[in-house]
């Protein structure tokens, strides 16, 4: 299940697609208000619902415990999501070179996984409250990718070192990655929106 909202502006070579990836317990509508706050008039929205159910809550991949991922399922779901985006790009005539993932929590983690495993699918990414999902056996070259990490200094779910580890990995593989620390926990705040808008304005 997914939601697609075409761009409100004129479709041209600069048109973007925002791939919205919700957190645990969310659905395909959760991040649409967030996308609207970013004020990008030439962006279409593609928002899939996670297919894994944990205690009645949708997620994008299984986990064994808090912060401990089922890596085999993560790999499978990463490729499944990448294949979905590829198929949707044909269905909706989207430019695969202009797809920006905007992920929160579990959605940010699978967005990072797509960057690391199927980098051809995404041009850039905004990751809210992420951690390292996996380290692939073969590291990609992400020198053409731009990534914003927005993390909470008081996040009870993602420790600061886990965020820093992801930053270091993305930097190691060449991504143009920046990190913004918010005076918050795991929840999103207005400061996250300000940071994301500013980052997007520089693309």
Language-model features: where?
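Active-site signature of alpha/beta-hydrolase-fold catalytic machinery across serine-
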Residues: 33, 113-117
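C-terminal catalytic histidine-bearing segment of alpha/beta-hydrolase fold enzymes
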Residues: 164-167, 171-203
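Serine-hydrolase catalytic machinery in alpha/beta-hydrolase-like enzymes
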Residues: 1-94
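Short alpha-helix in the alpha/beta-hydrolase fold that links the catalytic acid
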Residues: 31-34, 159-169
């Amino acid at each position: 299940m997914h939601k697609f909202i075409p761009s409100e502006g004129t479709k041209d070579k600069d048109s973007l697609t925002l791939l919205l990836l919700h957190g645990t317990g969310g659905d395909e509508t959760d991040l649409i208000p967030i996308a609207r706050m970013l004020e990008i008039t030439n962006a279409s929205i593609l928002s899939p619902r996670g297919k894994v159910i944990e205690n009645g809550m949708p997620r994008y991949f299984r986990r064994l415990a808090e912060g401990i991922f089922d890596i085999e399922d993560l790999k499978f779901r990463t490729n499944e999501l990448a294949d979905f985006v590829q198929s949707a790009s044909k269905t909706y005539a989207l430019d695969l070179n202009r797809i920006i993932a905007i992920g929160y929590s579990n959605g940010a983690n699978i967005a990072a996984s797509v960057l690391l495993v199927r980098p051809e699918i995404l041009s850039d990414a905004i990751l809210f409250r992420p951690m390292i999902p996996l380290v692939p056996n073969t590291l990609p070259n992400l020198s053409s990718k731009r990534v914003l990490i927005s993390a909470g200094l008081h996040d009870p779910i993602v420790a600061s070192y886990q965020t820093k580890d992801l930053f270091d990995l993305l930097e190691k593989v060449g991504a143009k990655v920046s990190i913004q620390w918010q005076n918050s926990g795991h929840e999103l705040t207005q400061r996250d929106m300000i940071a994301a808008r500013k980052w997007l304005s520089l693309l």
